[in-house]
Amino acid sequence: MDFAESPGLLINKLAHAMALDMDRRLKSYDVTMSQWAMLKQLWRQEGRSQVELQEFLGLDGATVTGLVQRMTHLGLIQRRPDPSDKRVQRVFLTERGRALEQITAVFEEEVNAHALAGFSADERVFFLRLLTRALQNCEGK
């Protein structure tokens, strides 16, 4: 199969190119793609447990623990014990973590606009539907 005929390779290459573009933009704020992905989850809902973040991000526990430690050290997030179960650590944004939401939202829009440049509005909608369906197929939904 030719490279251009392999959806998996093309999607992977697109994701990699978009991630590099986003990573380049985030670098000026000392944030990595993985850290930004966690911040996005916390912007949607603060106070998630590390296990919940692990599930949302599709990462293993050790990776999430390392991310949380680094992000705490950078002053992006803080951990607090769950009031009803002291064994559970809840993750909350700091002011610095909150402040990055609007800035990085612009970055995300720019990266997406760059990737979809030349697409009509209908093509964008159709492309996203196809990607969503392919993802659902792979996830068994």
Label each residue range with its predicted role.
Residues 45-49:
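Short capping segments at the starts of secondary-structure elements
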Residues 38-39:
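Short alpha-helical "packing" element that flanks the helix-turn-helix/winged-helix DNA-binding module
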Residues 1-29, 74, 95, 138:
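N-terminal leader segment of winged-helix/HTH proteins
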Residues 19, 24, 51, 69-132:
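Charged, amphipathic alpha-helical coiled-coil/dimerization segments
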